[in-house]
């Protein structure tokens, strides 16, 4: 019994270290989402902070279209961050025996 608990504690510590490393890696990435065939692009960090927005000048005459494209480009970048985060977090917990139904990140 004690061996199982010690092993579980070691496993938890290793997983915590891996998760922290993955979170640090995620914070450093930048991704760009785009919409309208590249007429609008939004660059976000792993923490989903906006770094850059690029808008094709031809869209200035259609504010409603521009609003939709900015939102779509932001959502595209956000989805890319989510996918990258899921991948890195999955790698961080690879080989760890989690209880049934427990998913990471929490």
From Swiss-Prot:
Its main location: cytoplasm. It is found in: Cytoplasm, Nucleoid. GO terms for molecular function: DNA binding. Keywords: Cytoplasm, DNA-binding. It comes from the Bacteria. The keyword Cytoplasm applies. InterPro entries: YbaB-like_sf (IPR036894), YbaB/EbfC (IPR004401). Pfam families: YbaB_DNA_bd (PF02575). GO terms for cellular component: bacterial nucleoid; cytosol. Residues 81-106 are annotated as: Disordered. Homodimer. Binds to DNA and alters its conformation. May be involved in regulation of gene expression, nucleoid organization and DNA protection. Belongs to the YbaB/EbfC family. This is Nucleoid-associated protein Smal_0858. It comes from Stenotrophomonas maltophilia (strain R551-3).
